[in-house]
Amino acid sequence: MFAQLAPSPSPSPANVSHFVHRRTFRQCTYAVSASLPTANSSRPPPIQIVGGKDLNLDVTRKDDSIGFKLEANEDEIDWMNLESDIRLWTRALRPVQWYPGHIMKTEKELREQLKLMDVVIEVRDARIPLSTTHPKMDAWLGNRKRILVLNREDMISNDDRNDWARYFAKQGIKVIFTNGKLGMGAMKLGRLAKSLAGDVNGKRREKGLLPRSVRAGIIGYPNVGKSSLINRLLKRKICAAAPRPGVTREMKWVKLGKDLDLLDSPGMLPMRIDDQAAAIKLAICDDIGEKAYDFTDVAGILVQMLARIPEVGAKALYNRYKIQLEGNCGKKFVKTLGLNLFGGDSHQAAFRILTDFRKGKFGYVSLERPPL
């Protein structure tokens, strides 16, 4: 659907941008196993999160241009604390990196194909819109007309949709929320792509050229739903699509009617992901290959995140798994679930938790909030 905003009762000033932070916290403690991998093992030593962290952050937002201060509300502080904690938690973990060989080849081809595109459709995961955009995206697109699609809109709340719509609207970016599985928003996306590139044939006529189809490229990270959207637009399965990263490995142009050509492209990731908090979120949302991460590490971080997100909380974790979260230690929670349900297999327990999240078993959960 198009981004439709609910009325906001108290809009904040446009230039609120400065922050004064005062932070006190008891840090998590981490222990890295001293055991070494065996000769037959390609995995690094196992890493265990041992302790929890209790953080208290007071934030005052200041707008120097208008001379007054605004207190950040409790929800904003909670999210800022959580983002800070995620970065702390990931320091002890093996870095999450995934760059299969076909991506380098595809990146070169994509830059060439961009020259042919009238409009570019960037698809992101609505649960983590900031973590699912390529750092080179703006440089690649330049001044080309652009549509931002936040897919999996069925997995976030109406409030989250409104907040993200406001955030991107302020940047002048056209946003459509879609559900690639059910096709919601897909046809509206096709109409918008045609309308944005409507002047293409007008210019061609002025030059005495025949009209041609509008060319729209669909690009984005792995497994964010690019191929599924194309299949919904075409109303038949033309592009290979599956709920895992790396299925699409080659670029493919397909026709939508007489006047729109669509380019399906493989998921594009940077060669190195410097922001490991973002990398963990990619792993949680299944937007990066499974070989890139340790399931128990990622599930442990997810448990700690869910416990801190108001829409979920430790109570929801207990109600689902009948396990108390002790000391905000997600790794211990995963291990206990493994003992209770899977004969001590922590990997299977981690897989269950991640699968439950990916299937929406915890309700509408966004793992990111728009920056203040």
From Swiss-Prot:
Pfam families linked to this entry: MMR_HSR1
A GO molecular-function annotation: GTPase activity
Signal sequence, renumbered to the chain: none
Keyword GTP-binding recorded: yes
Location of the CP-type G domain: 107-271
CDD domains assigned to the protein according to its UniProt record, in alphabetical order: YlqF (cd01856)
A cellular component term, taken from the record's GO annotations: chloroplast
Subcellular location: Plastid, Chloroplast
Top-level division of the source organism's lineage: Eukaryota
Keywords per UniProt: Chloroplast, GTP-binding, Nucleotide-binding, Plastid, Transit peptide
Binding site for GTP: 151-154, 223-228, 267
Motif (DARXP motif): 125-129
Keyword Chloroplast found: yes
InterPro entries registered for this protein in UniProt: G_CP_dom (IPR030378), GTP-bd (IPR006073), GTP-bd_ortho_bundle_sf (IPR023179), GTP-bd_ribosome_bgen (IPR019991), P-loop_NTPase (IPR027417)
Transit peptide start-stop: 1-33
Cross-referenced PANTHER family: DAR GTPASE 3, CHLOROPLASTIC, MITOCHONDRIAL RIBOSOME-ASSOCIATED GTPASE 1
UniProt comment concerning the protein's domains: In contrast to other GTP-binding proteins, this family is characterized by a circular permutation of the GTPase motifs described by a G4-G1-G3 pattern.
Family under the similarity heading: Belongs to the TRAFAC class YlqF/YawG GTPase family.
Function: GTPase that may function in chloroplast ribosome assembly.
Name recorded for this polypeptide: DAR GTPase 3, chloroplastic
Species for this entry: Arabidopsis thaliana (Mouse-ear cress)
